[in-house]
Amino acid sequence: MRWKRTIQLLDVHCEGEIGRVAIGGVPKIPGNTVAEQLHWLNTDPKGEELRRFLVLEPRGAPIGSVNLLLPARHPDADAAFIILQPDQAHASSGSNSICVTTALLESGIVEMKEPETVVTLETAAGLVRATATCRDGRCEKVRLTMVPSFVHELDVGIDTPQWGRIKLDLCYGGIFYALVDVGQIGLTIGKANAASLVQAGMVLKELINRTVPVVHPEIPAISGVAYVMFRDIDADGAIRTCTTMWPGRADRSPCGTGNSANLATLHARGKARVGDVFKSRSIIGSEFEVGLQAETEVAGKPAIIPTITGRGFTFGLSQVALDPFDPMANGFALTDVWGPLAGDI
């Protein structure tokens, strides 16, 4: 076989959300920092080509992300990574941080120490401390100390043709989120409503980014609302979530960065204090523990340090390659399985 590019992938899922980890064959990504590398992936044609090669058909699939494992730039980090998705490369993700930690330890890239191994991950949003509980050569669960999370604006009003005026919270949890109480769109969070929730999320994301610009005050490479996360409260008090992802799918996990952003809103409203721990439940019923570890500031704004605890599971090892004569090197997506906005890919 005459392949011009090969990349090795370890398949991992975190509470149902797939995060494949590129552990070999990753080309050198230009940039002196992970934030600069993220910017290159999102602005340079060669960066877009790499992302599309890994994420889109025929090598990729609509579900999940691909994590590019990179050499750490920060002296305190064990590894760096950037998340690739159909829309762009992203700075941070809780479920993908758990997938990457699990991959590093169970593949032996980072030495596993029992009963606990601390792995420091470098992201474009900052350092994430991952504390893994390990037993019998297996990573059983991971507690993430997330980057500082803060409220950009609470109770933002958006006029919509479908649901009238919607109130939402704009918050940062490693990327920017619009957090919407799901009852405002006449739905509940459950498997049967996944397609309707996704469609609503795509509409709201477009409206929000058109009317309410957001930029991180210290990291300009992180801007715009990445996801709309719908939220509700279950009968047992758990926070039920559904994060909607372009071009049209639902996060299978409870969503780490989304719950970090949501915890910032609870803190701002006086509903969460340092030491509190909440349960978050996804659209498929999988769970994270969400904790408020500390208070801090970001560019003078009140902020918090959240923790997210969940599980990662390896389920495969694969290699993707490019035949030099393959006309579909740049990948493609169709609306039949990729979602209503896949025609824009």
UniProtKB/Swiss-Prot annotation:
Its EC number is 5.1.1.8. The keyword Isomerase applies. GO terms for molecular function: 4-hydroxyproline epimerase activity; trans-L-3-hydroxyproline dehydratase activity. It catalyses: trans-4-hydroxy-L-proline = cis-4-hydroxy-D-proline. The active site is at S93, C255. Signal peptide: none annotated. Keywords: Isomerase. The keyword DNA repair does not apply. SUPFAM superfamilies: Diaminopimelate epimerase-like. Catalyzes the epimerization of trans-4-hydroxy-L-proline (t4LHyp) to cis-4-hydroxy-D-proline (c4DHyp). May be involved in a degradation pathway of t4LHyp. Can also catalyze the epimerization of trans-3-hydroxy-L-proline (t3LHyp) to cis-3-hydroxy-D-proline (c3DHyp) in vitro. Displays no proline racemase activity. Belongs to the proline racemase family. This is 4-hydroxyproline 2-epimerase 1. It comes from Rhizobium rhizogenes (strain K84 / ATCC BAA-868) (Agrobacterium radiobacter).
